[in-house]
A protein has these predicted regions:
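Short Pro-Gly-centered flexible turn/kink motifs
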Residues: 58-72
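Glycine-rich (often Gly-Gly/Gly-Pro-rich) flexible segments and glycine-rich loop motifs
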Residues: 1-43, 105-107, 161-163, 294
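Polybasic, low-complexity Lys/Arg-rich tracts in intrinsically disordered regions
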Residues: 63, 83-654, 681
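C-terminal tail/sorting-segment detector
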Residues: 662-684
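Short, structured beta-strand/loop micro-motifs enriched in basic residues and often containing a Trp
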Residues: 43-51
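Short glycine/proline/serine/threonine-rich loop/turn segments at secondary-structure transition edges
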Residues: 78-80, 655-661
């Protein structure tokens, strides 16, 4: 049947009449919708009634007729709308999309599950975190219940309607899209602008294959100003359905009342005001309880979201490894990579965070395609997502072990001795060792009985006639990293390289090959080479001297870091007294308005004036006086312990607007009695 009648008209007078177009007047309304007329409305904007109609048509007893209707809105140039051809390209594009939806039996492509956004205010910044429900739980029935999640976009506005974020125009030059301050997407080869499902000639930006993150720190904010953040998850659309369906994203909902005050917000929206910390506030901090990271990498935990931390909770960071290559028949010789990181809350005995090859942030893990293994990113330091308000900053600048010349040396005593790593096999034996000297000249004797397969520092095979077995040494080499199944340390084997080929062990000329012995008695591999060529009787190491041989290496499965979150309930009285001197009124002078004041779109609403006191105690009393000493207003501050600002609406105690002029303020900290007196000016 199609659309047979359309009328748009003002609400008629409520005077009693049987002929007015009002819903209780059956005959008038029947005649209205039964008339074959499509009439546009160009009169004044007012309270309008919109009537669509199709018909008349017969509706027989027992028969069901289904009616489908679509109401489309577009911005189109008046020149085209008023032309004989009545061109409306934006409207026609919408019609194409609606037609596809109709033909698909109203099964819409759905956006991903809505994330929950959390905003934590700080001094000059806002920390934004969100959960992972969108990227892990999304299923789109329109596309066969697949997870079509693609990424996140984060928007910031100072307007409750997000109007100042809507700066991207469509193909017709009409502002239509919001510009994100942060975007991240899956590393899946889907990036850039779509060439399907164009909205008024504009494709959807799928991102840059950055990898997914669940945290963003916005440093481009001003203390005391209220910001509105919105986070949307988006999918990658449906390019193969009809003309293509554009990617879908979550809605941002900010519900306002008649006074334009926020009534409710969606869970993906956060309203936050950054602030200076309160006078006397003791910031939470972290204590490193125990660090066992001998390999050389660094992990620094930092508190990012104060509101989410758990007081006095202890955490342990641990690692998972993947073996890349190994020495045959030797349990302590292999090349490995660190492929995962996990954090356990020791108080709750619960894993609260982890990254591994199946779930990681951005480029925190990378894959070596040629050898088919995953590793923590060694090219640059990286940060984890936020867990319990904490973020880990990780720096592991190497993916294989190597000799650490800078941190190797004498732990106890001294002497002339040279330690040289091998160019290949050391990477299989990159542990920490102690060379321990003894008063017993035969404290260790060579164990291996087979001369073949022994290599020197430059990876050359040493001829068997240059190998001396059964030699005794006045020192031994202990592996400080690995333990045997009985809990004892692994001892390294040693053989002599008879450099001068005289068949006798000459300490001043020959070299000592240090390595491991296989289960079958053969040499497993060389860790390093020792020589005393430069030592004299006076400079030869003495009994109880210890030399540390250190290798830098990726995080090992037995490495760990333990730390505790410290949160303080009280205030620092000395700090409070000093900070009271820094109390300021912003802006001072107040001239007509300032950026902290929220805009109102209703012309009949008054301006929401605002003046801020900063660096104030969390519990305090402010009294404001005229210059002649008349009390204007009192402000009782009862902030959260960390919040150090308070806004004044610039109204008197009687609810009247204050006059222009000079004012005095008196602030008293309720906890300590410290006081501050100052002044500010108001110019209207």
């Amino acid at each position: 049947v199609g659309l047979t009648a359309f009328r748009l008209f003002p609400v008629p007078s409520h005077a009693q009449s049987n002929s007015s177009w009002w819903f209780k007047n059956d005959q008038a309304m029947w005649e209205l919708i039964g008339e074959n007329i499509l009439e546009e409305y160009i009169d004044d904007i007012s309270n309008l009634i919109e009537v669509f109609a199709s018909g008349p048509f017969p509706l027989y007893k027992g028969r069901t007729e289904r009616i489908s209707m679509s109401e489309l809105h577009s911005y189109d140039p008046l020149e085209g709308l008023n032309s004989p051809a009545h061109t409306a390209p934006a409207l026609y594009e919408l019609k194409k999309i609606v037609q596809v939806i109709y033909e698909k039996d109203y099964r819409f492509a759905q956006p991903p599950k809505m994330p929950t956004l959390t905003a934590t205010p700080a001094d000059g910044k806002v920390i934004l975190t969100w959960d992972n429900i969108s990227d892990t739980r999304t299923r789109d029935p329109f596309l066969g219940n697949i997870n079509d999640f693609e990424g996140y976009k984060l928007f910031r506005a100072t307007d409750k309607y997000f109007a100042d974020a809507e700066v991207i125009t469509d193909g017709y030059g009409t502002p239509m899209f919001m510009k994100p301050i942060f975007q991240c997407d899956l590393k899946d080869g889907k990036f850039g602008f779509t060439d399907f499902g164009l909205v008024n000639g504009v494709g959807y930006n799928l991102g840059s294959d950055t990898g997914i993150s669940h945290v963003f720190v916005d440093n481009n904010v001003m203390n005391g100003r209220t910001y509105y953040y919105g986070l949307v998850a988006y999918d990658y659309g449906a390019p193969h359905i009809g003309p293509g369906i554009s990617p879908s994203e979550n809605n941002l909902v900010v519900e306002l009342d008649e006074a334009e005050e926020v009534r409710s917000i969606g869970k993906n929206v956060a309203i936050v005001t950054p602030f200076k910390p309160a006078a006397g506030y003791k910031q939470p901090d972290i204590t490193i309880d125990e660090s066992n990271l001998p390999g050389g990498g660094k992990i620094v935990p930092t508190i990012l979201a104060r509101s989410s931390i758990k007081k006095d909770h202890r955490y342990q960071v641990s690692f998972g490894i993947d073996t890349i290559a190994s020495l045959p028949q030797y349990d302590y010789g292999f090349v490995y990579t660190t492929k995962s990181i996990a954090v356990t809350d020791l108080n709750d005995n619960l894993v609260v965070y982890q990254e591994n090859p199946t779930k990681f942030v951005s480029t925190n893990l990378v894959k070596n395609d040629s050898l088919d293994y995953w590793s923590l990113n060694t090219k640059a330091p990286f940060s984890t997502d936020v867990f319990d308000g904490i973020q880990l900053n990780v720096d592991m600048p190497f993916d294989q072990g190597f000799y650490d010349y800078a941190n190797s040396g004498w732990v106890q005593g001294s002497g002339m001795m040279r330690v040289v790593p091998t160019i290949r096999e050391s990477s299989y034996l990159a542990w920490d060792y102690h060379i321990i000297f003894s008063s017993n000249a035969s404290v260790y004797t060579t164990t291996t009985s087979i001369k073949t397969g022994i290599r020197d520092a430059v990876d050359n095979r040493i001829p068997t006639n240059e190998i001396l077995l059964g030699q005794s040494f006045g020192f031994y080499v202990k592996n400080e990293t690995l333990l045997k199944s009985d809990g004892s340390h692994v001892l390294m084997d040693m053989v002599v390289h008879d450099v001068n080929k005289n068949g006798v062990f000459d300490k001043s000329e020959d070299k000592i090959i240090v390595g491991g012995m296989r289960n079958d008695g053969k040499w497993a591999g060389t860790a390093f080479v020792i020589d005393f060529n430069l030592a004299s009787t006076a400079t030869y190491p003495k009994s109880d001297d210890i030399f540390r041989v250190k290798f830098s290496r990726p995080f090992w499965k037995d490495d760990y870091l333990k730390f505790t979150i410290n949160s303080y309930d009280g205030i620092d009285a000395d700090s409070l007294a000093k900070t009271m001197d820094n109390i300021r009124v912003v802006p001072n002078p107040y001239v007509a308005t300032n950026v902290m004041e929220t805009a109102v779109s209703n012309q009949f609403l008054n301006q929401r004036r605002s003046l801020m006191f900063t660096n104030v105690p969390a519990q305090a009393l402010i009294k404001i006086f005229t210059i002649s000493g008349v009390l204007v207003d009192e402000i009782s501050i009862n902030n959260s312990p960390e919040k150090g600002i308070v806004h004044w609406d610039m109204l008197t105690r009687e609810g009247l607007e204050i006059a222009a002029g000079m004012y005095l303020f008196h602030i008293e900290a309720l906890a300590t009695g410290d006081q501050k007196i100052g002044k500010f000016a108001v110019i209207k």
